[in-house]
């Protein structure tokens, strides 16, 4: 009975499918733009916190916050890439519909399939693109495929070194001379030595202040994680 109903059921209009898909793609692009704005807004707050930490010579907090900014900016770059790929999907779908007017049906598009596959690897886009892939497979625009995980792992040491360089650039750009005046060895030493090892009364006071700083740092990290996800 189901096969009979499928035969009787008219094929969806390519133009209508295109309108529906492009509407969904535009909505996803707007969601990405909103997420980027939220991340950049939160980054401005983090920049203020970095300046305050640098003024009190708390380079542990300043560097940790700078690392969060580096991570956020990388997320923003990935979001812009996702948006660009969705715009490309919309463009290629328009071309497929134009061809369908001539041949009478939607043809498979290797480029759309490639773009959908790429976006399915992005955590923020995986669920949405899974739904898109089902609809497009059903309409004959792409072939059914299994999204295999691809190992894009880079050498951890090279990656860490690259991140450290970016962190230093962010610190210099935001904290300016305050961060630049501190020797590299001193900056690294401040990161390595735990606050609880302090023995003098002055250092003990710094530890007490550090507790509040750590709580503030965790709050900032939580807010950034929320807008990045």
From Swiss-Prot:
<dbReference type="GO" id="GO:0070676">
    <property type="term" value="P:intralumenal vesicle formation"/>
</dbReference>
<dbReference type="GO" id="GO:0000815">
    <property type="term" value="C:ESCRT III complex"/>
</dbReference>
<comment type="similarity">
    <text>Belongs to the SNF7 family.</text>
</comment>
<keyword id="KW-0813">Transport</keyword>
<dbReference type="GO" id="GO:0007034">
    <property type="term" value="P:vacuolar transport"/>
</dbReference>
<keyword id="KW-0967">Endosome</keyword>
<dbReference type="GO" id="GO:0005829">
    <property type="term" value="C:cytosol"/>
</dbReference>
<keyword id="KW-0653">Protein transport</keyword>
<comment type="function">
    <text>Component of the ESCRT-III complex, which is required for multivesicular bodies (MVBs) formation and sorting of endosomal cargo proteins into MVBs. The ESCRT-III complex is probably involved in the concentration of MVB cargo.</text>
</comment>
<dbReference type="GO" id="GO:0015031">
    <property type="term" value="P:protein transport"/>
</dbReference>
<dbReference type="InterPro" id="IPR005024">
    <property type="entry name" value="Snf7_fam"/>
</dbReference>
<keyword id="KW-0175">Coiled coil</keyword>
<feature type="coiled-coil region">
    <location>
        <begin position="15"/>
        <end position="60"/>
    </location>
</feature>
<comment type="subunit">
    <text>Component of the endosomal sorting required for transport complex III (ESCRT-III), composed at least of VPS2, VPS20, VPS24 and VPS32. Interacts with SKD1.</text>
</comment>
<protein>
    <recommendedName>
        <fullName>Vacuolar protein sorting-associated protein 24 homolog 1</fullName>
    </recommendedName>
</protein>
<feature type="region of interest" description="Disordered">
    <location>
        <begin position="193"/>
        <end position="215"/>
    </location>
</feature>
<dbReference type="GO" id="GO:0005770">
    <property type="term" value="C:late endosome"/>
</dbReference>
<feature type="compositionally biased region" description="Acidic residues">
    <location>
        <begin position="206"/>
        <end position="215"/>
    </location>
</feature>
<dbReference type="Pfam" id="PF03357">
    <property type="entry name" value="Snf7"/>
</dbReference>
């Amino acid at each position: 009975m189901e096969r009979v109903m499928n035969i009787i059921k008219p094929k969806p209009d390519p133009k209508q499918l295109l309108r529906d898909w492009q509407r969904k793609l535009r909505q996803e692009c707007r969601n990405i733009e909103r997420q980027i704005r939220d991340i950049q807004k939160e980054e401005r707050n983090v920049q203020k916190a970095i300046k305050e930490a640098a003024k009190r010579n708390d380079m542990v907090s300043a560097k940790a916050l700078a690392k969060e900014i580096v991570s956020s900016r990388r997320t923003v770059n990935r979001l812009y890439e996702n948006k660009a790929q969705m715009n490309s999907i919309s463009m290629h779908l328009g071309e497929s519909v134009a061809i369908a007017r001539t041949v009478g049906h939607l043809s498979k598009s290797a480029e759309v399939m490639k773009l959908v596959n790429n976006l399915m690897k992005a955590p923020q886009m995986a669920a949405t693109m899974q739904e898109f892939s089902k609809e497009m497979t059903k309409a004959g625009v792409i072939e059914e495929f299994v999204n295999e995980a691809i190992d894009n792992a880079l050498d951890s040491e090279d990656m860490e070194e690259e991140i450290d360089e970016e962190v230093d650039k962010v610190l210099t750009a935001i904290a300016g001379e305050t961060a630049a005046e501190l020797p590299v060895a001193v900056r690294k030493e401040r990161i390595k030595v735990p606050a609880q090892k302090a023995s003098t009364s002055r250092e003990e006071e710094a530890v007490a202040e550090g507790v509040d700083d750590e709580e503030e740092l965790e709050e900032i990290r939580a807010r950034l994680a929320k807008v990045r996800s």
